[in-house]
């Protein structure tokens, strides 16, 4: 996960 991405991206990243 990276700062700047929404929570939905937290699962993909």
UniProtKB/Swiss-Prot annotation:
It is found in: Secreted. This is Bradykinin-potentiating peptide T. Keywords: G-protein coupled acetylcholine receptor impairing toxin, G-protein coupled receptor impairing toxin, Hypotensive agent, Metalloenzyme inhibitor, Metalloprotease inhibitor, Protease inhibitor, Secreted, Toxin. Signal peptide: none annotated. The keyword Ion transport does not apply. GO terms for molecular function: peptidase inhibitor activity; toxin activity. Acts as a bradykinin-potentiating peptide (BPP). Induces endothelium-dependent vasodilation that is reverted by NO synthase inhibitor, suggesting it activates molecular targets on vascular endothelium leading to NO production and vasodilation. It appears to induce vasodilation through muscarinic acetylcholine receptor (AChR) M2 (CHRM2). Does not inhibit the angiotensin-converting enzyme (ACE). Does not act via bradykinin B2 receptor. Expressed by the venom gland. Belongs to the non-disulfide-bridged peptide (NDBP) superfamily. Scorpion BPP (group 1) family. GO terms for biological process: regulation of blood pressure. GO terms for cellular component: extracellular region. Transmembrane segments: none annotated.
């Amino acid at each position: 996960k990276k700062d700047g991405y929404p929570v939905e991206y937290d699962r993909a990243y």
